Structure formats: structure tokens, C-alpha cells
Amino acid sequence: DSDLVIQSDSGALAGVEFTTSKGVFLHNLPMRGGSGTLFDDVPRDRWKRFVAQTNPGLVVLQFGGNALASMTQPSQVARYASAIGKNLDHFKALMPHVPVVFVGPSDMGLAPNEFPMLAATIDALKHTAFVHGAMYWDLQAVMGGPGSMAQWVDEGLAARDGVHFSPKGAKLIGQRLDMALRRAMRASQPTEPLGL
């Protein structure tokens, strides 16, 4: 057993990293309640240092759900998608050879049309991801499509609010994303010629 003690009279601790020389490393930038439009507000020199230190091989962004609660007009969807596009461009400029996967919003709500801009937002984000050089993973489709949230709630995979996943549901989504990423990696590997 080891203890880690950090003492300081000033400054703020932004994070701690524990790594080894092998395996997959995940750097999580939690933005609880965020809509994914603030990455380009961080000074570019800080991003450059972070990229140089971590050497990322993949960027995964998952946003859209928090923004949906306040969207009632197509013009709001267009503005949001435009802001996401600027942030995707930001990542592509910082890491031009690193693939970016944008995970779209989940299905949301238990009543029809509870989130009237959900379909339009998914379509806009999908288009934005492709136009800005990112891949799009359709979380709503993975769940079962429009209206699937009710079944996820019934099966204990989502909270009764019809918006948030339960720990069990979050684990299932994580496993499905992992499988999709692994399939994509295998598909991108060069195949060996058959020695006939």
C-alpha cells in the first residue's frame, strides 16, 4: 500500500495521471452539464502542451443531450451544430492525424415529442461531424432508435427521468462503443494477400 499526499498553499490541482508503458489510456475531461462548445475557449498553448504530453491516438466526444433541453427552434439547432463544428475544427487543427469520433445524443424522453428538436439535432450533428472530418456514432440508433428510451427505463438501463443512463446502462453503452471501435480498427487494418 502506498499513500499519495499533495500539499500546497496555492494553486489548483487540475488532475493527476498514473500511467504505465503499455495498454490503452483514457484521459477524461469531464464537463458535467456541458454542451461541447467550449474547447476552443481553452488557450491553444495549453492544448498543445496537453497533446505533446499525452500523444492521443483517438478523440471521443459525446455531447448534445444537455443542449437539447433548451432547444425549441431549428435555428437553435443550426447554431449549436455550427458551434460543434468549430470545436471539431479546433481538434483537427491541434491533432490533424488523430481520428475524432463524435457520439451523438441518446434517445431521450418517455413521451412522444418531449424533446421536439432531438431528431433535427441528431441529423445536424451527424452532418456536422462528417463535414468537419469526424466520425459519428449514432447513440440513439444503438439504443434501438426513436422511442427506445422507454424500454431502457423499463429494463433498468436508464433512470426514470428518461434522460440519464443507469450505471448498468452506461456500462452497456460503453461496451457497445468499445465493440464498434474495435470493429472499425480491424476493418482499417491491411489484409494479408492470400498465398494461392
Located regions from the model:
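Loop/turn elements at helix/coil->beta-strand transitions in domains of secreted/extracellular proteins
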Residues: 24, 54-59, 95-100, 131-135
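Active-site segments of SGNH/GDSL-like serine hydrolases
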Residues: 60-68, 89-122, 138
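A general structural detector for well-ordered alpha-helical segments in enzyme core domains, enriched
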Residues: 47, 80-91, 121-125
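Low-complexity, Gly/Pro
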Residues: 7, 46-52, 71-72, 92-93, ...
